[in-house]
């Protein structure tokens, strides 16, 4: 029953508005949260940066001080304006009130925006301890939280553990997101496992190819002394980038992101040799 209620709550939640299925609170006989939820549901919609937006959620908290979606909703405005201290205070309160509903969002933001890799690992693994490894996706929909966790380990220097997490994830039936083979290929490349790296990049090409994948493929060919394949890959990377097919997140710099200038410089080096 608890799992069903959790699904009802999460399935209708919105990152921007933190709206929940009010009936789930009713099913749990949580009248306080139900009334706060219904108030938000009926209240006029406001842009997140307006005072009225915060007044609305403050009123919901007056109705029910434990209504954790209000803290999450209010925090989003501070995240967007760069007031990360206030964002963290609000999200900490949301997590305190309902860890299962909020650890995913706080953990993802610590990874995506703050580069707080140890904090992100702590949040994601705390959530996984309860719901299992398949804890869902990050807020941009491109990364499974387990893959984000692996990248956090990479960024704190634990590449072997990052590789193991990704390999285990690929052996499961869990969804992977857009870039797992790309990131795994880079990890193999950084560890000098060039054949494995190339295999991962080829798998990425079959699933979803983009400029950065071809860029790193060219580096692997270079390391393997395959100059013709290297040229073809870097040429394709440049062409693909100019076609607009590359990693893109309008809110943050992504791990393993490569920019056009880097592709152009590598292209120039390859064809001058």
Where do the model's predicted regions map?
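TPR alpha-solenoid repeat register
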Residues: 70, 102-104, 137, 145, ...
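Structural motif corresponding to the intra-repeat A-B loop/turn of tetratricopeptide repeats
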Residues: 47, 81, 113-114, 156, ...
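Terminal, low-structured helical/coil segments at or just beyond the last alpha-helical repeat
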Residues: 20-23, 30-31, 160, 164, ...
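N-terminal leader/linker segments that initiate helical-solenoid repeat arrays
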Residues: 19-72, 81, 89, 264-272
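Flexible helix-coil transition and linker loops at the boundaries of alpha-helical arrays
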Residues: 24-28, 58-62, 92-97, 128-142, ...
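TPR/TPR-like (Sel1-like) alpha-helical repeat modules
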Residues: 95-99, 111, 122-130, 205-209, ...
